[in-house]
């Protein structure tokens, strides 16, 4: 089997050296070339035709975002961004994902060599995922048409969504058309700390419903979406007649924290048939068991179809496990989940 050919673009000679060490330490991939800036990278891409590009966000001569935008227009290819953990870095990274980057890696703030080498397995996994990703499904999405406001629903009704690779754009596409009359939404997207708040703030500006990073103990309200904070699990709990959010530092589940399974299992227990579960694009099997639990508790469950997924991993696993009632294209998810949740009477659990 041929190796995954990687080209790394970074203005730091140390980072280029570290990325080369990491990539070449895995038997199924090789670093074919490195470039100090996008202008050099342009020629090397033509020469080496890599399978995956790793791209630093902030560089001299040409900004990483400008280069990414041109690359996706002229020669689309899988790109993994390398970003700093600053607030500005997280906003730029989210913009890169919007432009077509498949995923991102965050640079450690201290001890960069030791930190990056400790990330070796994670970086290799992201490169493998990017090499297999569907670029057709990851074209920048146009703004979806706003859905008409429906009747106000019982606060017992809610929607739970899980996603990973490719999920930031898929979630935007699902939330943007939702009217203020929508039920509450609880969302787990695999993301490191520092990025979930920027992600929520970005969505809040784009959507009619309120979107925020979830906080422990807060009441779950209709017309709002709550994003699980990075590196912390989010669960649905009850406080008397109301739903509330529980945030905790339990062990990683399916190697993830936050975990989609943790959210879905709690929704199955607390909301049962009053919920709709949605699993979107992502690598691995996180959410499959939880979605089955939701279906068995009476919830209606949706999975994004393969044609519209950047990575058809999590939806496939959920389908194979028997947890999915319906498979739909990303363009239909918002409409379908609202129609489904509006159909049945709320049952007090």
Swiss-Prot record:
Catalytic activity: [protein]-L-glutamate 5-O-methyl ester + H2O = L-glutamyl-[protein] + methanol + H(+); L-glutaminyl-[protein] + H2O = L-glutamyl-[protein] + NH4(+)
Active site (UniProt): 164, 190, 286
GO biological process, any: chemotaxis
Keyword Iron recorded: no
Modified sites of kind 4-aspartylphosphate: 56
EC number of this enzyme: 3.1.1.61, 3.5.1.44
GO cellular component, one term: cytoplasm
InterPro entries, A to Z: CheB-like, CheB_C, CheY-like_superfamily, Sig_transdc_resp-reg_Me-estase, Sig_transdc_resp-reg_receiver
CDD domains for this protein: CheB_Rec (cd16432), REC_CheB-like (cd17541)
Cross-referenced PANTHER family: PROTEIN-GLUTAMATE METHYLESTERASE/PROTEIN-GLUTAMINE GLUTAMINASE, PROTEIN-GLUTAMATE METHYLESTERASE_PROTEIN-GLUTAMINE GLUTAMINASE
All residue ranges annotated as the CheB-type methylesterase domain in the record: 152-344
This protein's UniProt keywords: Chemotaxis, Cytoplasm, Hydrolase, Phosphoprotein
Domain of life: Bacteria
Lineage: Bacteria, Pseudomonadati, Pseudomonadota, Gammaproteobacteria, Enterobacterales
GO molecular function: phosphorelay response regulator activity; protein-glutamate methylesterase activity; protein-glutamine glutaminase activity
The protein, known as: Protein-glutamate methylesterase/protein-glutamine glutaminase
Posttranslational mods: Phosphorylated by CheA. Phosphorylation of the N-terminal regulatory domain activates the methylesterase activity.
Keyword Iron found: no
Stated family: Belongs to the CheB family.
Major localization listed first in the record, in broad terms: cytoplasm
